Amino acid sequence: MNVKIESSWQQRLQEEFDKPYFEKLVNFVKNEYGKAHILPPGHQIFHVFNSCPFQNVKVVILGQDPYPNPGQYYGICFSVPDGVAIPGSLSNIFKEIHQDLGKPLPNSGNLDRWVKQGVFPMNSVLTVRAHETGSHRNIGWETFTDAVIKKLSEERENLVFMLWGSYAKEKASLIDTDKHLILTAVHPSPRSADYGFFGCKHFSKANTFLRSRGIEEIDW
């Protein structure tokens, strides 16, 4: 199957695109776009892939579902466009960065500047019906994004994987810990951040690891 995606990802994921499950997934999602309000707009489904080539990835942040409210999600996990109110989880991420590294709290929740530096924030599920959280779970996206994680683990070295919350932590089994650093904590959601996300210092730990491997750190 021909999928429009950045060339370095195309090369490594074509095997997935050619599998029967992916064809079923694409047909299901196309049908959904035809009958319901689906997020993000179709051309933004692979936005994080198109913005961060395979060889540029330094830090992987794993999420679960896209934001279900129109105008928020545009293909980058946790991120929202300029001018959109910063969601609670992202606000807590910024608070932890402030506490950890002394960075001022930003006015925008747009994480494009992270992605340009090699941060790869990816949801496990890449589409959702508007206002219906989790509505596109178990249709094939998880199989695809698990393959992405495996490919990064196998073909890259010295990556940092940030796994927040029980769902993301389950993905640790896909990652080679001899080659990569895994950082785990509770989810930054307002419901859980006080129970171990605040104070996790993942952002300084990531930079310390990258520096120790001779890799330029992230300006969080």
UniProtKB/Swiss-Prot annotation:
It is found in: Cytoplasm. SMART domains: UDG, UreE_C. The active site is at D65. GO terms for biological process: base-excision repair, AP site formation via deaminated base removal. Pfam families: UDG. One of its GO terms (molecular function) is uracil DNA N-glycosylase activity. It is an enzyme of class 3 (hydrolase). It catalyses: Hydrolyzes single-stranded DNA or mismatched double-stranded DNA and polynucleotides, releasing free uracil. Its main location: cytoplasm. Its EC number is 3.2.2.27. Keywords: Cytoplasm, DNA damage, DNA repair, Hydrolase. GO terms for cellular component: cytoplasm. Belongs to the uracil-DNA glycosylase (UDG) superfamily. UNG family. NCBIfam families: PRK05254.1-1 (NF003588), PRK05254.1-2 (NF003589), PRK05254.1-4 (NF003591), PRK05254.1-5 (NF003592), ung (TIGR00628). Excises uracil residues from the DNA which can arise as a result of misincorporation of dUMP residues by DNA polymerase or due to deamination of cytosine. This is Uracil-DNA glycosylase 1. It comes from Bacteroides fragilis (strain ATCC 25285 / DSM 2151 / CCUG 4856 / JCM 11019 / LMG 10263 / NCTC 9343 / Onslow / VPI 2553 / EN-2). The lineage of its organism: Bacteria, Pseudomonadati, Bacteroidota, Bacteroidia, Bacteroidales.
